[in-house]
Amino acid sequence: DYIVSAIGNHNVNLWLNNYIKSNNIVSAVFYIWNEALDIGCHVALVKSDREYDYNNLFNRDKNGEMYDISSYVKKGQDVSKSYGGCTGTFIPYGASISLNSSMLFLNLLKKHVEGRISENVLCSEKGDDFYFNKAGFQKSMIYEMQKDKISMRPLSKIREGFNAT
C-alpha cells in the first residue's frame, strides 16, 4: 500500500505524518511539493516503521517560528500570492514544475518498489531560477549548495548542511 500526498501543504502533511505514526499505519508515504516560481520540487519517502520522518524536514528559528530546512527559498520571504482574500492564497508555480515533481515521484516510487531504498529519503530537483530571480526573491543556501540537478538525501542526514538560510 502507498499513500501519496501531493497537496503541497506542510501543515496538512505534518498532521498526516503524525496521524500515521500515532495509529501505527505501516505504509510508504510519498509527500510531494513544488517550490515557488519553478525553482524546484521535492518528494519525501517516509515509512513509519523506519527511523526519521517528515518532521525532520523542519526546524525552528530563534523566534520559535517553524521553517522548512529543505526549501530553496531563503527564509523570511513571502512568496505567496493572494486573490480575493485568504481563500485565494497560493504559491505561484508553472505547470512544467508539476510535471517534474510527478516524474521525480515516479522515479522514487520505482526505486522503492525495486527495493533500492532502505531508509526514509528526500529527493529534490532544482528548477530554473529565471522567474524567481526576476521577481526579486532570494534563493536559500540549500539551492546554491546543491550541485546536481537531482539530489537524494536520507532523512537521517537531512539536517547536515540544511540549517543554513
Identify the meaning behind each predicted range.
Residues A6-T165:
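Glycine-rich phosphate/adenylate-binding loop
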Residues Y2:
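Short, Asp-centered acidic motifs that coordinate Mg2+ and/or phosphate
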